From Swiss-Prot:
MF terms in GO: 2-hydroxyglutarate dehydrogenase activity; L-malate dehydrogenase (quinone) activity
Stored SUPFAM superfamilies: FAD/NAD(P)-binding domain
Keywords noted in UniProt: FAD, Flavoprotein, Oxidoreductase, Tricarboxylic acid cycle
Pathway: Carbohydrate metabolism; tricarboxylic acid cycle; oxaloacetate from (S)-malate (quinone route): step 1/1
Taxonomic placement: Bacteria, Pseudomonadati, Pseudomonadota, Betaproteobacteria, Burkholderiales
Gene: mqo
UniProt organism field: Bordetella avium (strain 197N)
Protein name (database record): Probable malate:quinone oxidoreductase
Cofactor dependency: FAD
């Protein structure tokens, strides 16, 4: 049932935010226990209107195939691929969940949200080529990256990505890696599919135009959620046994409103982004890949430049960027006062400490803000030398709010990943951060289960059903090559992806 008013007085679970994270967790919970009464609250008038929206993110099936920030070089010249392996196998969990939903009919057609798309890394210059060659050597030796290809041959690279090589000087060394089993994902379309399926089930409601302004823990351990209807301005409340905050950049404020001790000292640092977008068919049809470069020094991970195939609403386009910037908004539809309202006595010192220790990031963001349109286009031409200005338009990306938290050996730490903050009594969970984000939504949902519903993960409760939804739950795909190959072949078949 989908409504914009008539809130129930009570629910088992309330989810704040109607993006990919809440939709995924609700889907998993209803699959495990269909009798659960779940209410989802969204302040806007539809789901997936912030970072989950197709044009608000890069849509990379984020498997750490091409993102070089996950594979830093060591001082001895070798490459650390441990973080890449973590992200790589986390994406397998999402593929398994989506395959389950396709097989059960909850998602009628996977091509409504996912398409095969090669993932490529590209560098130029002798030192960078040396790094990529070593990276390929180490990654291709691991079963998780079976099928990875490498080339320094301009002719071969031109066959794979002609737009990237056309018009490029042959004087500078260039190298690429390619994995053909990658994907382009429209997380906005996926969120709509998940919520549509949920609304067809008894015990699920999504309510739009509901702004959560208060969270209060009750004596019995439940939560009273104070809500203002953005249309009628009426005040409403709902009581829930468990609250999940999947509100993107808005999660910081809601974590603070909850008052849980575990959230003390947390703050956020917002980073905005701009894409260049090309909808010219003659261009987009000649580029079939996500080509990732190396991030500029001092830049945040989500600012790695890349030239991507995007398929949104059945329309094929090109995307380049992002160009980072600074906005004090925590959400794209948020307020310019978001950052300032988030400052509390408990987080002001961590925030000041982070500001002091991250001058390269500050300088990078300032340089991006001051960058002219001409400078932005010159960056695109490093990846597409013959790009023409009139073929491209600007598109504003979703806001990314990086985590600022108290450190163990310093006052404040800036983190670029995601983090789940949960209460000691397991009645509250808030998801903070940005990258890798949507692609690991299933992994995050499992983390919520393990931290907040551990008593249900037993053989006589949810565990058998969970292994139907996620067949490799409890299996380490980083070490079990046979299980890795088997599940990837299976999910590729169901999702119409390439398998090597």
């Amino acid at each position: 049932m989908t409504t914009t008013s008539n809130l129930p007085e009570q629910a088992d679970i309330v989810m704040i935010g109607a993006g990919i994270m809440s939709a995924t967790l609700a889907t998993v919970l209803k699959a495990l226990e269909p009798s659960l009464k779940i209410v989802m609250l969204e302040t806007l008038n539809d789901c997936a209107m912030e970072s989950s929206n197709g044009w608000n993110n890069a849509g990379t099936g984020h498997a750490a195939n091409c993102e070089m920030n996950y594979t830093p070089p060591r001082p001895d010249g070798t490459v650390d691929i441990s973080r890449a392996l973590e992200v790589n196998t986390e994406f397998d969990l999402s593929r398994q969940l989506w395959s389950y939903l396709v097989k059960t009919g909850a998602i009628p057609d996977p091509q409504a949200f996912i398409h095969p798309c090669p993932h490529m890394s590209m560098v130029w210059g002798a030192d960078n080529v040396k790094y990529l060659r070593q990276r390929f050597k180490e990654m291709s030796a691991h079963h998780c990256y079976r099928g990875m290809e490498y080339s320094e041959d301009p002719k071969q690279i031109a066959e794979w990505v002609p737009l990237v090589m056309q018009g490029r000087s042959g004087n500078e060394p260039i190298a690429v890696t390619r994995i053909v089993s990658g994907a382009d994902v429209d997380y906005g379309a996926l969120t709509h599919l998940l919520i549509k399926s949920l609304t067809e089930q008894a015990g699920f409601e999504v309510h739009y135009l509901k702004h959560v302004h208060d969270l209060a823990r009750q004596r019995d351990g439940s939560w009273r959620i104070g809500i203002r209807d953005r249309g009628s301005k009426a005040q409403q409340t709902i009581q829930a046994k468990f609250v999940f905050v999947g509100a993107g950049g808005g999660a910081i404020e809601l974590l603070q409103k909850s008052g849980i001790p575990e959230g003390h000292g947390y703050g956020g640092f917002p980073v905005s982004g701009i894409w260049l977008r090309c909808d010219v068919d003659s261009m987009s049809e000649r580029h079939h890949a996500k080509v990732y470069g190396k991030a500029p020094h001092g830049s945040p991970p989500m600012s790695v430049p890349h030239l991507d195939t995007r398929i949104i609403g059945g329309k094929r386009s090109l995307l380049f960027g992002p160009y980072a910037g600074f906005s004090s908004r925590f959400l794209k539809h948020g307020s310019l006062t978001d950052l300032f309202r988030s400052v509390r006595p408990g987080n002001v010192l961590p925030m000041l400490d982070v500001a002091k220790d991250n001058w390269p990031l500050t300088e990078y963001l300032v340089s991006q803000v001051l960058q002219s349109a001409g400078h932005q286009f010159e960056m695109l031409r490093q990846y597409y030398p013959e790009a023409r200005n009139h073929d491209w338009t600007h598109a504003v990306a979703g806001q990314r709010v990086q985590i600022i938290k108290p450190g163990t050996d310093k006052v404040g730490v800036l983190e670029f990943g995601t983090e789940l903050v949960t209460s000691a009594d397991r009645s509250f969970a808030a998801l903070l951060g940005a990258s890798p984000g949507a692609s690991t939504a299933a992994f995050i949902a499992l983390e919520v289960l393990q931290k907040c519903f551990a008593d249900k993960l037993t053989a006589d409760a949810w565990l058998p059903r969970l292994k139907t939804v996620i067949p490799t739950y409890g299996v380490d795909l980083k070490t079990d090559a046979e299980a890795c190959f088997s599940i990837r072949k299976s999910t590729a078949s169901v999702l119409n992806l390439d398998y090597v």
